[in-house]
Amino acid sequence: MDACRPAEKRSRKPAHPLRRNISEDMKNFAENTMNELLGWYGYDKVDLQDSEAADARNRVKRNHISVLKENAVPKPLNVEKKIPPSSSSSSSSSSSCSSEPVRNGDQDPPTVPVSPSASSASPRHNMNVIVPLIKPSAVEDVQNVQIVCVWCQKEGMKRYSLLMGSELKSFCSEKCFAACRRAYFKRNKARDEDRHGDKSPSPGQTLDTPTRLMLKMNNNNSSTRVCDWCKHIRHTKEYLDFGSGEERLQFCSTKCLNQYKMDVFYREARAALTSSKEEENHPKPAATSENQTLLTPDAWESPAKSLSPQTPTASALQRTPVCMRVQMATSPKSPTGPSQGTPEQPRPPHMPLPFIRPPLHAQSLRSPTPNLPHNPPHPLSPTQRVPFAPPPHYPLPYLPLHPTFPPQMPPPWPQPMMMMPYPVFVPIPIPIPIPIPISPQNSHRGVIRSLQEPEKEPAGSQRVKTERCVSPVSASERQVIQCLRRDSVKEERNDTHIQTLRKALYTSVLTSTASASLDGRIVSPASLYSLARSTAIQAASFSLDSSSGQIPSPLSDCEDVKENSYLCGRGNDSANQWTAEQMDCQSDQSKEGKGEEETPQDVEHTYARSVPPKLREKNTHVNTQTHLHTQIWEKNTQVDELGPEQSVRDDAEPAVKRRCLRIRDQNK
């Protein structure tokens, strides 16, 4: 029949499980396996005596599959409320056992597992199945108990608890609970594998540790080792022993040992720093630290020595502030040396602490504490000294011989830098603008200057006094005016032409002597005065167009002067005036060639005509042309009989026309 069934139906499970009779061998094997698993996880051993007790315990285990389900052991008070009245006469043990199917909805009669007669006949049925479980979360929420976690040693709320015999271990989180259970499991499993006859308790246990935590197989006790740093079970036989006596520790590898040493070293360094700072403010006697026990690196090389921390005592003055004592000895305020106590004088906050330990690779895993200068019989080795510290062979009694060092001189030895970056100041040249004064004679002081500025002339020069006196303008200023004229052409006013005429006239007056001679004729101050007066009258009568904005050339300046001087001449003074104008123009051109020409200074002198550089290079040619123009004007202008005012009116238009023609030629 089975051969005719399809293949896919062979693996199908039956709808209802089949109850089979289990042999005694299988029961014993299940009991041993269950006890082994319970022992690995730190639970009590369960003994199954007969099949009925085995069935009852199996039902309890089915109801409590996992420890994390937080199901408590059935309580008689709660059970009696749910028991039917027909079974109220049964014992408490039978009611507790029979109440489980009722609570879970099973339809079996309550007296099926254990009958009242059977319970009275066998007293072992009265014992409840004790399985260590976690308390319900509702009870914990009501209590809100503050506990110290057994695993992480931190304070927190009680979340999980594990009952181990008479000891109840509490955990703050599921993570700690799982880690502790895993550690016990590995420890018990390793004990089972080792099977050596060492009955001494492991480092993580004490003598009063319950024996249920140790798995018993074939009546042989087996123990294992747990690393005191990583708290893990290693399947290695070569554990590293560290220390002796009660402080004997075991590590599974050199990595754990080194990490433990680093942790101890770090805690010792922090304790030393804290105690030294407290001692500076409030010194304490040395007897207060005798009762303290701290595992320090002192025991790394001397295991027989007592493990007591070396806290700062009264010899702290000899132990630290080497650089502090040097500064005390060198300062003029305290020349007495190190005989005075340091607690009275506050240490600067930036002072490096010389008792800070170097890293472990620099000291070869040795403690620098017992080899400091307070222990002279054992000098420091080169690898154990503090970096840049002075040698201990030169004690402090040598320092009072030289109590006062210069403040600028450094100490005889370099100060400890404590492996910190040392700033080195490197001078970097930074360009800084420095104002350089420039002499006003050789530089351009501005295009427009004030009229009140004093005039500076050579000491040997003399000047003919006129009605208006102006200050000279240097050659560089004339060049600036030349550039302004080339850039933009502005509309000239009538005063511009008046200024042009005055410029040529007044500069011609500035001669080296009061009277100049040319060709045997003398120019007197009277003739110059009359010439200036006639020029002013002629300038007042001019009316020029705005189109004549261009400034005439230096030749036109001389011609204007000649025209005005001829029109202003009277009688016999005309010849003297012509020769004076000729001489003035020549002297003006010569001074411009040398860069020493003096021009009038006025508000509108910007529009004055300056001599171009090409004409300056040809001083001889300019002087020749000026002389020829003077000869031509002497021949063409012979109107001495007319008055000065009439002559100005008659010749005003030809002069303007000639100027316009010159401007047009320059524009071409």
UniProtKB/Swiss-Prot annotation:
Biased composition annotated in UniProt, kind: Low complexity: 86-99, 114-123
InterPro entries from the UniProt entry: RAI2/SOBP
A GO term from the CC aspect: nucleus
GO terms under biological process: animal organ development
Region (Disordered): 1-24, 72-124, 190-210, 274-388, 584-605, 633-668
Function: Implicated in development of the cochlea.
UniProt name for this protein: Sine oculis-binding protein homolog B
Source lineage: Eukaryota, Metazoa, Chordata, Craniata, Vertebrata
Gene: sobpb
